[in-house]
Amino acid sequence: MVKSMIAVISDIHSNLEALNAVLNDIKNRGIKKIFCLGDIVGYGANPNECVELIRDLNCLSVVGNHDYGVLGKESLDYFNKYGAIAILWTKKVIKNENLKFLDSLPLIIEENIKGKKVIFSHANPKHPEIWEYLFPDYVDDVFNYGDLIFVGHSHIPFVNSEEGNLLLHEGKIYLDEDKKYLINPGSVGQPRDGINKASYCIFDEKDFKIEIVRVEYDIKKAYEKIVKNRLPEWLGERLFLGR
């Protein structure tokens, strides 16, 4: 049933073309509830439009480290040179109301779904403000913090259980309700798993199923906007590579 499904998106990074493609896919599936795992801005050329879409759709969203960078809450020393340049550019163009929205976002959202503690966080929920990466082969002690834990940050989609990695890149998997899982939906706006399609995931609460979904979008248009706004060309080139 569509009512039992939620979409989880992450790491949009001001890529309007990718975000629109993903939101259209979600809409076509009839899914109404969307969670966003942060990093709405950074890297790309449409920060205002992306923030406004997330805000106007009433997505339940947490804040990411690039959002913190634009807010001046995170030192640029912690970003690579391309990320720092994009943050400085974003600070110049972002509207005050969109800054206020980013500033209102929490570090963690906790939900109760079918009696399960479900965590939504940009990075490791152990210390969310440290922005520690979690990967398929490195999950730290994350399973101490919830039953289903959704994180972004690495831009690599995967589903991991306490026993090890279960799913990478794309596909569906039924979860065992007696086990704990770490789920990364991948990145909408800058995938880094070698696949240049936007990535997000769908969680079916009724069937206890996860699907990682890949969506094609107009990469050329996103690239051209980056170049036009004199952002580092590599930020556009990497979109074609999925890196």
From Swiss-Prot:
GO molecular function terms here? phosphatase activity
GO CC list: cytoplasm
Coiled-coil residues: none
Q: Which InterPro entries match?
A: Ap4A_hydrolase, Calcineurin-like_PHP_lpxH, Metallo-depent_PP-like, Pesterase_MJ0912
Protein origin, superkingdom: Archaea
Q: What is this protein called?
A: Uncharacterized protein MJ0912
Species this protein is from: Methanocaldococcus jannaschii (strain ATCC 43067 / DSM 2661 / JAL-1 / JCM 10045 / NBRC 100440)
